[in-house]
Amino acid sequence: METQWTRMTANEAAEIIQHNDMVAFSGFTPAGSPKALPTAIARRANEQHEAKKPYQIRLLTGASISAAADDVLSDADAVSWRAPYQTSSGLRKKINQGAVSFVDLHLSEVAQMVNYGFFGDIDVAVIEASALAPDGQVWLTCGIGNAPTWLLRAKKVIIELNNYHDPRVAELADIVIPGAPPRRNSVSIFHAMDRVGTRYVQIDPKKIVAVVETNLPDAGNMLDKQNPMCQQIADNVVTFLLQEMAHGRIPPEFLPLQSGVGNINNAVMARLGENPEIPPFMMYSEVLQESVVHLLETGKISGASASSLTISADSLRKIYDNMDYFASRIVLRPQEISNNPEIIRRLGVIALNVGLEFDIYGHANSTHVAGVDLMNGIGGSGDFERNAYLSIFMAPSIAKEGKISTVVPMCSHVDHSEHSVKVIITEQGIADLRGLSPLQRARTIIDNCAHPMYRDYLHRYLENAPGGHIHHDLSHVFDLHRNLIATGSMLG
């Protein structure tokens, strides 16, 4: 069906990509990310550097790609600029050293910013596809991300045709691209499982300059075995949601959930699945991870909408082997739709995300360790946190065996403000911040979420801090962080 295009090896296709090109990769997490071109681009960079020639690309993605892909590009010094999110230890190190420029963005806004031309032209898009048609129809795989926008905006397109994927994966896709202001229509999604688009992206077939065949699974990893800390946080989340149902603030049929990625979120999903008082529910999220597949099988989750399937190869094979069951229960959308503020607000999504650090007034830091070193990025947490019906942030109360408190007087970096964070939950308890003044919020967070070994310090800070509506002692507000830098422990 796609024989009209030039077949190339990955190394041959990498020759198309020139120094300083803006390159856009498909995928959202490892799902749907290119498998062959990252290594080939790294190889080309090494060859050019050995020849004393400059070679670096500027790299746009949907969210993260596989850490291995970012690692190999980083090791080859092949990237000069990166956006909007990453999870690679090697790339993270270079970003924090200033060797790579990084732009941390709300994921729902990336496609729009590209369409507005804020980043310049996309020279080459590298897109994983499950199938092509001669008229330029491109069927994507397990991670939609920003691939539709990349396909439409790029000057040249390299397709990685991945034969690993079942052709029926296209049945999961719902591709719709919003118009441009001031004539942008509403997105007519009124139910988590509504479909409003097509199963493919239509582009000018002349833009496709190479097709590289692969047969490789996504690099999805099984998460670590649950620990007691994660399980206690999950229990507290379920307790809170049941209380909300009892008070009539969550309807009997429940509300759609958004859940981030990681061990805490996986534990929460497992506990929701086990609790008989939680009714079957839907998800309107950005990522579907391992636990969701099981809950779809059992019927606890009746339908799930997201931008990617970030799951193990075994779970993906289970879906492919049972597409008659799963095709009507999973929808994969572009991230400007999965993370769309209009839809999140309309559906009344309950957002469950993890933070690095919270201050006593309810601000949250989810990106920068000690305020300076990037961890991964804000990702989609801000899209959901700002617009959700209930915005819940979760974290352990301490890290590094108590040397670090997650609750501090003032966040060293703020990603989510006190005006949007509604609930904070640690293994210690639940801080419901709705309707509370700043000082009430502070006492609630300290009493319910801070670890006992830090509560006295935080209460003393609050009592001694001068102020009016908000109390802060700017001479001592970062003493915990200073102690950590000086001694390796916040308590010194």
Explain the meaning of each model-derived region.
Residues 1-492:
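Conserved alpha/beta enzyme-core scaffold
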